[in-house]
Amino acid sequence: MEYNTSELCDLYPDMVDVVEPMFESYGGRSSFGGSLVIIKCHEDKGLIEETIAADGGGKILLIDGGGSSRRALVDAAIAEQAMDNDWEGIVCYGAVREVDALEELDIGILGVASIPVGAISEGVGELNVPVNFGGVTFLPEDHLYIDTTGVILSPEPLDIE
């Protein structure tokens, strides 16, 4: 589904929070939305790999990697598995890699930077905890809407129809 975040902000000014502009789009889909599954980790992609192995049910995986650009938390293998398992997208407050391959995948992917060095995979991190970055607090099951203009957050699904 295509979203217009500007229009959603106009229609629901009291229901949405705007995430500060900090992300670059790396995936093949520039507009996406859904409810959140949250991972908090630092330079470790193990919990990400475990989580995207399950059916995403059209949800968005939000990764709080502390904004680190030293090691990529998302690579082509992770993104492809997420796409195959019905994840709507991945929003990574951290780095990604294999950018050319990511652009070819039919999934939304946002990250703060790209770097060729991959993260370790030890499984250290937290699943479905509140996280705060970009001027907002994200809670599990909140709803995120993304297009080329920006990223907005709502505690409830917005009536788009």
UniProtKB/Swiss-Prot annotation:
One of its GO terms (cellular component) is cytoplasm. Its main location: cytoplasm. It is found in: Cytoplasm. GO terms for biological process: regulation of RNA metabolic process. The keyword Cytoplasm applies. Gene3D superfamilies: Ribonuclease E inhibitor RraA/RraA-like. One of its GO terms (molecular function) is enzyme binding. It comes from the Bacteria. InterPro entries: RraA, RraA/RraA-like, RraA/RraA-like_sf, RraA_gpbac. Keywords: Cytoplasm. Belongs to the RraA family. Globally modulates RNA abundance by binding to RNase E (Rne) and regulating its endonucleolytic activity. Can modulate Rne action in a substrate-dependent manner by altering the composition of the degradosome. Modulates RNA-binding and helicase activities of the degradosome. Homotrimer. Binds to both RNA-binding sites in the C-terminal region of Rne and to RhlB. This is Regulator of ribonuclease activity A. It comes from Idiomarina loihiensis (strain ATCC BAA-735 / DSM 15497 / L2-TR).
